[in-house]
Protein backbone atom coordinates (compact mmCIF):
# COMPACT_ATOMS: atom_id res chain seq x y z
CA UNK A 1 0.00 0.00 0.00
CA UNK A 2 2.79 2.45 0.94
CA UNK A 3 4.65 1.59 -2.27
CA UNK A 4 1.50 2.22 -4.32
CA UNK A 5 1.06 5.60 -2.65
CA UNK A 6 4.67 6.46 -3.41
CA UNK A 7 4.19 5.71 -7.11
CA UNK A 8 0.96 7.69 -7.17
CA UNK A 9 2.76 10.62 -5.57
CA UNK A 10 5.39 10.48 -8.28
CA UNK A 11 2.69 10.44 -10.95
CA UNK A 12 0.78 13.43 -9.58
CA UNK A 13 1.38 16.60 -11.60
CA UNK A 14 3.57 19.42 -10.40
CA UNK A 15 2.20 22.94 -10.81
CA UNK A 16 4.37 26.00 -10.42
CA UNK A 17 4.14 27.43 -6.89
CA UNK A 18 1.58 30.18 -6.46
CA UNK A 19 3.20 33.57 -6.07
CA UNK A 20 2.41 35.97 -3.23
CA UNK A 21 0.43 38.74 -4.88
CA UNK A 22 -3.19 39.76 -5.17
CA UNK A 23 -5.03 37.76 -7.79
CA UNK A 24 -7.90 39.56 -9.47
CA UNK A 25 -10.82 37.62 -10.92
CA UNK A 26 -9.08 36.61 -14.13
CA UNK A 27 -5.92 35.46 -12.37
CA UNK A 28 -7.86 33.65 -9.66
CA UNK A 29 -9.96 31.80 -12.23
CA UNK A 30 -6.86 30.80 -14.19
CA UNK A 31 -5.25 29.37 -11.06
CA UNK A 32 -8.36 27.47 -9.97
CA UNK A 33 -8.90 26.01 -13.43
CA UNK A 34 -5.25 24.96 -13.60
CA UNK A 35 -5.52 23.16 -10.27
CA UNK A 36 -8.76 21.45 -11.30
CA UNK A 37 -7.19 20.28 -14.54
CA UNK A 38 -3.89 19.11 -13.09
CA UNK A 39 -5.35 17.47 -9.97
CA UNK A 40 -8.61 16.20 -11.42
CA UNK A 41 -8.63 13.04 -9.29
CA UNK A 42 -8.91 14.97 -6.02
CA UNK A 43 -10.47 18.31 -7.03
CA UNK A 44 -13.68 19.62 -8.53
CA UNK A 45 -14.22 23.24 -9.57
CA UNK A 46 -17.72 24.65 -9.85
CA UNK A 47 -19.57 27.94 -9.52
CA UNK A 48 -22.41 28.17 -6.99
CA UNK A 49 -23.83 31.28 -8.64
CA UNK A 50 -22.93 34.72 -9.93
CA UNK A 51 -22.36 38.12 -8.39
CA UNK A 52 -24.46 41.17 -9.25
CA UNK A 53 -22.11 41.93 -12.15
CA UNK A 54 -22.10 38.34 -13.39
CA UNK A 55 -18.80 37.14 -11.94
CA UNK A 56 -18.68 33.47 -10.98
CA UNK A 57 -18.65 32.53 -7.31
CA UNK A 58 -16.08 29.76 -7.58
CA UNK A 59 -15.72 26.86 -5.17
CA UNK A 60 -12.91 24.32 -5.41
CA UNK A 61 -13.63 21.01 -3.70
CA UNK A 62 -10.71 18.90 -2.49
CA UNK A 63 -11.27 15.30 -1.45
CA UNK A 64 -11.04 11.65 -2.40
CA UNK A 65 -14.48 11.89 -4.04
CA UNK A 66 -14.60 15.60 -4.89
CA UNK A 67 -17.69 15.48 -7.10
CA UNK A 68 -20.05 13.77 -4.68
CA UNK A 69 -20.75 13.24 -1.01
CA UNK A 70 -19.83 9.90 0.51
CA UNK A 71 -21.46 8.47 3.63
CA UNK A 72 -19.31 9.07 6.70
CA UNK A 73 -17.12 11.74 5.09
CA UNK A 74 -17.87 15.13 6.68
CA UNK A 75 -18.24 18.27 4.58
CA UNK A 76 -16.07 21.28 5.49
CA UNK A 77 -15.89 24.76 3.97
CA UNK A 78 -13.89 27.98 4.02
CA UNK A 79 -15.36 31.23 2.62
CA UNK A 80 -13.32 34.42 2.19
CA UNK A 81 -13.57 37.95 0.81
CA UNK A 82 -17.20 38.43 1.87
CA UNK A 83 -16.23 42.06 2.32
CA UNK A 84 -14.44 42.92 -0.90
CA UNK A 85 -11.86 45.18 0.75
CA UNK A 86 -10.81 42.48 3.25
CA UNK A 87 -8.33 40.69 1.06
CA UNK A 88 -5.93 38.56 3.10
CA UNK A 89 -8.32 35.62 3.42
CA UNK A 90 -8.81 35.52 -0.35
CA UNK A 91 -5.09 34.98 -0.94
CA UNK A 92 -4.67 32.62 2.01
CA UNK A 93 -7.31 30.29 0.60
CA UNK A 94 -5.59 30.23 -2.79
CA UNK A 95 -2.35 29.29 -1.06
CA UNK A 96 -4.17 26.71 1.05
CA UNK A 97 -5.47 25.09 -2.14
CA UNK A 98 -1.96 25.10 -3.57
CA UNK A 99 -0.57 23.55 -0.39
CA UNK A 100 -3.22 20.84 -0.10
CA UNK A 101 -3.01 19.54 -3.66
CA UNK A 102 0.78 19.72 -3.85
CA UNK A 103 1.13 17.86 -0.53
CA UNK A 104 -1.25 15.02 -1.37
CA UNK A 105 0.48 11.61 -1.34
CA UNK A 106 3.63 13.36 -0.13
CA UNK A 107 2.68 14.57 3.35
CA UNK A 108 0.94 11.79 5.37
CA UNK A 109 -1.07 14.24 7.48
CA UNK A 110 -2.45 16.14 4.49
CA UNK A 111 -3.12 12.88 2.65
CA UNK A 112 -5.17 11.54 5.58
CA UNK A 113 -7.01 14.84 5.85
CA UNK A 114 -8.00 14.87 2.18
CA UNK A 115 -8.92 11.17 2.19
CA UNK A 116 -11.21 11.60 5.22
CA UNK A 117 -12.74 15.01 4.53
CA UNK A 118 -14.46 16.77 1.66
CA UNK A 119 -13.09 20.33 1.73
CA UNK A 120 -14.91 23.15 -0.07
CA UNK A 121 -12.96 26.38 -0.59
CA UNK A 122 -14.51 29.65 -1.82
CA UNK A 123 -11.76 32.28 -2.15
CA UNK A 124 -14.14 35.15 -2.93
CA UNK A 125 -17.80 35.58 -2.03
CA UNK A 126 -17.75 39.22 -3.16
CA UNK A 127 -15.67 39.45 -6.36
CA UNK A 128 -17.40 42.68 -7.43
CA UNK A 129 -16.35 44.34 -4.19
CA UNK A 130 -12.76 43.19 -4.56
CA UNK A 131 -12.52 44.56 -8.09
CA UNK A 132 -13.91 47.92 -6.87
CA UNK A 133 -11.01 48.49 -4.47
CA UNK A 134 -8.48 50.78 -6.13
CA UNK A 135 -5.41 50.12 -3.97
CA UNK A 136 -4.37 48.66 -0.62
CA UNK A 137 -6.06 50.48 2.26
CA UNK A 138 -5.95 49.62 5.95
CA UNK A 139 -9.27 51.21 6.80
CA UNK A 140 -12.78 51.49 5.41
CA UNK A 141 -12.77 51.86 1.62
CA UNK A 142 -14.87 51.17 -1.45
CA UNK A 143 -15.49 47.49 -2.03
CA UNK A 144 -16.71 46.37 1.37
CA UNK A 145 -20.27 46.02 0.06
CA UNK A 146 -21.37 44.22 -3.08
CA UNK A 147 -22.13 46.10 -6.31
CA UNK A 148 -25.61 47.00 -5.00
CA UNK A 149 -24.05 48.53 -1.87
CA UNK A 150 -25.29 45.81 0.47
CA UNK A 151 -23.13 44.51 3.30
CA UNK A 152 -23.34 40.77 2.70
CA UNK A 153 -22.67 40.03 6.37
CA UNK A 154 -25.88 41.85 7.29
CA UNK A 155 -27.93 40.26 4.50
CA UNK A 156 -28.93 36.82 5.80
CA UNK A 157 -32.15 35.89 7.60
CA UNK A 158 -31.86 36.55 11.32
CA UNK A 159 -33.36 34.43 14.09
CA UNK A 160 -33.57 37.27 16.59
CA UNK A 161 -34.88 40.19 14.51
CA UNK A 162 -36.83 40.52 11.30
CA UNK A 163 -34.02 41.26 8.87
CA UNK A 164 -36.36 42.23 6.04
CA UNK A 165 -33.81 43.42 3.48
CA UNK A 166 -33.49 42.48 -0.17
CA UNK A 167 -31.43 39.31 -0.39
CA UNK A 168 -28.51 39.75 -2.77
CA UNK A 169 -27.42 37.25 -5.46
CA UNK A 170 -24.29 36.37 -3.49
CA UNK A 171 -26.33 35.75 -0.32
CA UNK A 172 -28.93 33.67 -2.13
CA UNK A 173 -26.16 31.60 -3.74
CA UNK A 174 -24.75 30.74 -0.31
CA UNK A 175 -28.20 29.89 1.04
CA UNK A 176 -28.87 27.52 -1.87
CA UNK A 177 -25.40 26.01 -1.56
CA UNK A 178 -26.07 25.17 2.09
CA UNK A 179 -29.11 23.16 1.00
CA UNK A 180 -27.07 20.99 -1.37
CA UNK A 181 -24.41 19.78 1.09
CA UNK A 182 -24.42 18.49 4.65
CA UNK A 183 -21.85 20.97 5.91
CA UNK A 184 -20.56 20.23 9.40
CA UNK A 185 -17.93 22.92 10.01
CA UNK A 186 -17.01 26.22 8.39
CA UNK A 187 -15.07 29.45 8.83
CA UNK A 188 -15.61 32.86 7.28
CA UNK A 189 -12.38 34.83 6.68
CA UNK A 190 -12.36 38.60 7.26
CA UNK A 191 -9.90 41.41 8.01
CA UNK A 192 -9.63 44.59 10.08
CA UNK A 193 -8.89 42.92 13.43
CA UNK A 194 -7.04 39.88 14.77
CA UNK A 195 -9.46 37.54 16.52
CA UNK A 196 -11.56 34.39 16.15
CA UNK A 197 -15.21 35.27 16.79
CA UNK A 198 -17.90 32.69 17.51
CA UNK A 199 -21.75 32.74 17.59
CA UNK A 200 -24.11 34.17 18.35
CA UNK A 201 -23.66 37.55 16.68
CA UNK A 202 -27.17 38.63 17.65
CA UNK A 203 -29.42 38.08 20.67
CA UNK A 204 -32.54 38.95 22.60
CA UNK A 205 -33.72 40.65 25.82
CA UNK A 206 -32.61 44.07 27.06
CA UNK A 207 -30.25 44.90 29.91
CA UNK A 208 -27.79 47.14 28.12
CA UNK A 209 -24.32 45.89 29.01
CA UNK A 210 -21.61 45.86 26.37
CA UNK A 211 -19.89 42.80 27.78
CA UNK A 212 -22.97 40.58 27.78
CA UNK A 213 -22.74 37.45 25.65
CA UNK A 214 -25.10 35.57 23.39
CA UNK A 215 -24.29 31.89 23.79
CA UNK A 216 -25.28 28.89 21.71
CA UNK A 217 -26.14 25.51 23.23
CA UNK A 218 -22.74 24.38 21.92
CA UNK A 219 -20.70 27.19 23.47
CA UNK A 220 -18.02 24.80 24.75
CA UNK A 221 -17.46 23.50 21.22
CA UNK A 222 -17.41 26.98 19.70
CA UNK A 223 -14.88 28.24 22.22
CA UNK A 224 -12.74 25.20 21.47
CA UNK A 225 -12.98 25.84 17.72
CA UNK A 226 -12.07 29.50 18.05
CA UNK A 227 -9.18 28.74 20.39
CA UNK A 228 -7.92 25.96 18.12
CA UNK A 229 -7.44 28.52 15.36
CA UNK A 230 -6.21 31.43 17.47
CA UNK A 231 -3.73 29.44 19.56
CA UNK A 232 -1.78 28.36 16.47
CA UNK A 233 -1.52 31.89 15.10
CA UNK A 234 1.42 33.52 16.94
CA UNK A 235 -0.07 37.01 16.75
CA UNK A 236 -3.78 36.29 17.11
CA UNK A 237 -3.28 34.36 20.34
CA UNK A 238 -1.69 37.44 21.99
CA UNK A 239 -5.03 39.21 21.72
CA UNK A 240 -3.81 42.80 21.50
CA UNK A 241 -1.74 43.19 18.34
CA UNK A 242 -3.86 45.82 16.57
CA UNK A 243 -3.35 49.42 17.66
CA UNK A 244 -6.40 51.22 19.07
CA UNK A 245 -8.38 47.98 19.02
CA UNK A 246 -9.96 45.97 21.81
CA UNK A 247 -7.95 43.35 23.65
CA UNK A 248 -9.18 39.80 22.99
CA UNK A 249 -8.02 37.33 25.69
CA UNK A 250 -6.48 34.28 23.99
CA UNK A 251 -7.47 35.79 20.63
CA UNK A 252 -11.15 34.75 20.80
CA UNK A 253 -14.47 36.46 21.55
CA UNK A 254 -18.20 35.85 21.44
CA UNK A 255 -19.45 37.83 18.46
CA UNK A 256 -22.31 39.49 20.31
CA UNK A 257 -20.10 40.68 23.16
CA UNK A 258 -17.80 42.33 20.61
CA UNK A 259 -20.69 44.08 18.89
CA UNK A 260 -24.15 42.82 17.92
CA UNK A 261 -24.97 42.48 14.24
CA UNK A 262 -28.12 41.49 12.43
CA UNK A 263 -28.22 39.14 9.44
CA UNK A 264 -24.76 37.62 9.87
CA UNK A 265 -23.61 34.54 7.98
CA UNK A 266 -22.19 32.56 10.90
CA UNK A 267 -25.47 32.64 12.82
CA UNK A 268 -27.37 31.64 9.69
CA UNK A 269 -25.05 28.66 9.12
CA UNK A 270 -25.50 27.40 12.66
CA UNK A 271 -29.24 27.97 13.02
CA UNK A 272 -30.60 27.05 9.60
CA UNK A 273 -27.90 24.80 8.09
CA UNK A 274 -26.73 23.02 11.30
CA UNK A 275 -23.17 23.96 10.32
CA UNK A 276 -20.80 25.27 12.96
CA UNK A 277 -19.17 28.45 11.62
CA UNK A 278 -16.84 31.00 13.19
CA UNK A 279 -15.53 34.30 11.84
CA UNK A 280 -11.78 34.74 11.50
CA UNK A 281 -10.39 38.29 11.51
CA UNK A 282 -6.92 37.77 10.08
CA UNK A 283 -5.23 41.16 9.76
CA UNK A 284 -5.28 44.53 11.51
CA UNK A 285 -5.06 46.13 8.07
CA UNK A 286 -7.98 45.25 5.80
CA UNK A 287 -6.02 45.39 2.53
CA UNK A 288 -2.28 45.23 3.35
CA UNK A 289 0.52 45.54 0.84
CA UNK A 290 1.45 42.44 -1.16
CA UNK A 291 4.85 42.07 0.47
CA UNK A 292 3.07 41.23 3.74
CA UNK A 293 1.28 38.20 2.28
CA UNK A 294 4.06 35.65 3.00
CA UNK A 295 3.96 36.67 6.67
CA UNK A 296 0.21 36.15 6.83
CA UNK A 297 0.57 32.72 5.23
CA UNK A 298 3.24 31.71 7.74
CA UNK A 299 1.07 32.92 10.64
CA UNK A 300 -2.08 31.14 9.45
CA UNK A 301 -0.95 27.97 7.69
CA UNK A 302 -0.96 25.73 10.78
CA UNK A 303 -4.24 27.22 12.00
CA UNK A 304 -5.99 26.66 8.68
CA UNK A 305 -5.00 22.98 8.65
CA UNK A 306 -5.73 22.31 12.31
CA UNK A 307 -9.14 23.93 12.07
CA UNK A 308 -10.17 21.62 9.22
CA UNK A 309 -9.30 18.63 11.42
CA UNK A 310 -11.93 19.74 13.95
CA UNK A 311 -14.66 18.54 11.58
CA UNK A 312 -13.86 15.09 12.99
CA UNK A 313 -14.80 15.96 16.58
CA UNK A 314 -17.63 14.21 18.34
CA UNK A 315 -19.91 11.53 16.93
CA UNK A 316 -21.35 10.64 13.54
CA UNK A 317 -23.45 7.88 12.06
CA UNK A 318 -26.72 6.94 10.42
CA UNK A 319 -30.25 6.24 11.58
CA UNK A 320 -31.96 3.13 10.13
CA UNK A 321 -35.39 1.59 10.42
CA UNK A 322 -35.92 -2.09 11.28
CA UNK A 323 -35.45 -3.12 7.64
CA UNK A 324 -32.09 -1.36 7.38
CA UNK A 325 -33.38 1.56 5.31
CA UNK A 326 -31.84 4.95 6.22
CA UNK A 327 -34.23 7.40 7.86
CA UNK A 328 -34.18 11.03 6.68
CA UNK A 329 -35.39 14.03 8.68
CA UNK A 330 -34.84 12.39 12.09
CA UNK A 331 -33.94 14.77 14.92
CA UNK A 332 -30.62 13.74 16.50
CA UNK A 333 -29.49 16.00 19.32
CA UNK A 334 -27.74 15.94 22.65
CA UNK A 335 -30.13 16.04 25.57
CA UNK A 336 -30.17 19.54 27.14
CA UNK A 337 -28.71 21.09 23.97
CA UNK A 338 -31.86 22.30 22.26
CA UNK A 339 -31.24 24.17 19.02
CA UNK A 340 -33.51 26.82 17.56
CA UNK A 341 -33.83 24.62 14.49
CA UNK A 342 -33.37 20.94 15.46
CA UNK A 343 -30.43 19.10 13.92
CA UNK A 344 -31.79 16.42 11.56
CA UNK A 345 -30.49 13.54 9.49
CA UNK A 346 -29.96 14.12 5.78
CA UNK A 347 -31.53 12.10 2.97
CA UNK A 348 -29.03 9.29 3.61
CA UNK A 349 -29.98 9.12 7.28
CA UNK A 350 -26.66 10.68 8.31
CA UNK A 351 -26.00 12.90 11.30
CA UNK A 352 -22.86 14.67 12.53
CA UNK A 353 -22.58 16.14 16.04
CA UNK A 354 -19.49 18.16 16.95
CA UNK A 355 -18.80 17.41 20.62
CA UNK A 356 -15.83 17.55 22.97
CA UNK A 357 -14.70 14.44 24.88
CA UNK A 358 -17.17 13.47 27.59
CA UNK A 359 -20.39 11.58 28.32
CA UNK A 360 -23.64 12.53 26.62
CA UNK A 361 -27.23 11.39 26.21
CA UNK A 362 -28.27 11.38 22.55
CA UNK A 363 -31.95 11.92 21.82
CA UNK A 364 -33.19 10.44 18.53
CA UNK A 365 -36.70 11.56 17.56
CA UNK A 366 -38.62 10.36 14.52
CA UNK A 367 -41.48 12.73 13.59
CA UNK A 368 -44.75 11.16 14.72
CA UNK A 369 -43.03 8.46 16.79
CA UNK A 370 -41.41 8.04 20.19
CA UNK A 371 -37.98 9.39 21.13
CA UNK A 372 -35.05 7.06 21.80
CA UNK A 373 -32.33 7.91 24.32
CA UNK A 374 -28.80 6.52 24.18
CA UNK A 375 -25.85 7.21 26.47
CA UNK A 376 -22.40 7.36 24.91
CA UNK A 377 -18.91 8.50 25.84
CA UNK A 378 -16.61 10.30 23.45
CA UNK A 379 -13.04 9.35 24.41
CA UNK A 380 -10.35 11.91 25.03
CA UNK A 381 -8.09 10.33 22.44
CA UNK A 382 -10.21 9.33 19.49
CA UNK A 383 -9.07 7.89 16.20
CA UNK A 384 -7.36 10.55 14.05
CA UNK A 385 -9.46 11.98 11.23
CA UNK A 386 -12.63 10.22 12.36
CA UNK A 387 -15.36 11.03 14.86
CA UNK A 388 -16.81 8.28 17.04
CA UNK A 389 -19.17 6.22 14.89
CA UNK A 390 -22.60 5.38 16.30
CA UNK A 391 -25.48 4.09 14.16
CA UNK A 392 -29.06 3.86 15.41
CA UNK A 393 -31.37 1.00 14.39
CA UNK A 394 -34.92 1.91 15.35
CA UNK A 395 -37.82 -0.55 15.82
CA UNK A 396 -40.05 0.98 13.18
CA UNK A 397 -40.48 0.81 9.44
CA UNK A 398 -40.16 3.90 7.29
CA UNK A 399 -43.19 4.86 5.27
CA UNK A 400 -43.34 8.00 3.13
CA UNK A 401 -46.67 8.98 4.68
CA UNK A 402 -45.38 8.84 8.24
CA UNK A 403 -41.88 10.28 7.95
CA UNK A 404 -41.22 13.26 5.74
CA UNK A 405 -38.33 12.88 3.32
CA UNK A 406 -37.61 16.60 3.07
CA UNK A 407 -36.44 18.65 6.02
CA UNK A 408 -39.06 21.12 7.24
CA UNK A 409 -37.84 24.68 6.97
CA UNK A 410 -37.37 26.77 10.08
CA UNK A 411 -39.40 29.99 10.01
CA UNK A 412 -37.46 32.96 8.64
CA UNK A 413 -38.83 35.22 11.38
CA UNK A 414 -37.67 36.38 14.81
CA UNK A 415 -37.65 33.40 17.14
CA UNK A 416 -37.03 35.13 20.46
CA UNK A 417 -40.39 33.92 21.79
CA UNK A 418 -39.18 30.34 21.39
CA UNK A 419 -35.61 30.78 22.65
CA UNK A 420 -34.66 28.39 25.48
CA UNK A 421 -33.46 29.77 28.78
CA UNK A 422 -29.81 28.84 28.12
CA UNK A 423 -29.33 31.92 25.94
CA UNK A 424 -27.51 34.70 27.78
CA UNK A 425 -28.10 37.17 24.97
CA UNK A 426 -28.95 40.76 25.78
CA UNK A 427 -29.70 43.79 23.68
CA UNK A 428 -27.43 46.78 24.34
CA UNK A 429 -28.84 50.13 25.36
CA UNK A 430 -28.72 53.11 23.02
CA UNK A 431 -25.61 54.43 24.75
CA UNK A 432 -23.83 51.12 24.37
CA UNK A 433 -24.92 51.01 20.75
CA UNK A 434 -22.97 54.19 20.02
CA UNK A 435 -19.98 52.75 21.85
CA UNK A 436 -19.93 49.87 19.40
CA UNK A 437 -20.15 52.03 16.28
CA UNK A 438 -16.39 52.50 16.18
CA UNK A 439 -15.89 48.72 16.09
CA UNK A 440 -18.51 48.26 13.40
CA UNK A 441 -17.19 51.06 11.24
CA UNK A 442 -13.64 49.77 11.13
CA UNK A 443 -14.46 46.04 10.95
UniProtKB/Swiss-Prot annotation:
Catalytic activity annotation: Cleavage of C-terminal arginine or lysine residues from polypeptides
Entry keyword set: Carboxypeptidase, Cell membrane, Disulfide bond, Glycoprotein, GPI-anchor, Hydrolase, Lipoprotein, Membrane, Metal-binding, Metalloprotease, Protease, Signal, Zinc
Chain segments annotated as coiled-coil in the UniProt record: none
Catalytic residues as annotated in Swiss-Prot or TrEMBL: 281 (proton donor/acceptor)
One GO molecular-function entry: zinc ion binding
Glycosylation-annotated residues: 38, 164, 363
Assigned GO CC terms: plasma membrane; side of membrane
Gene3D superfamilies: Carboxypeptidase-like, regulatory domain, Zn peptidases
Residues reported in the UniProt entry to bind Zn(2+): 83, 86, 190
Cofactor: Zn(2+)
Membrane topology per record: Lipid-anchor; GPI-anchor
Gene Ontology biological process terms from the UniProt entry: proteolysis
Lipid attachment locations (GPI-anchor amidated serine): 423
Protein name: Carboxypeptidase M
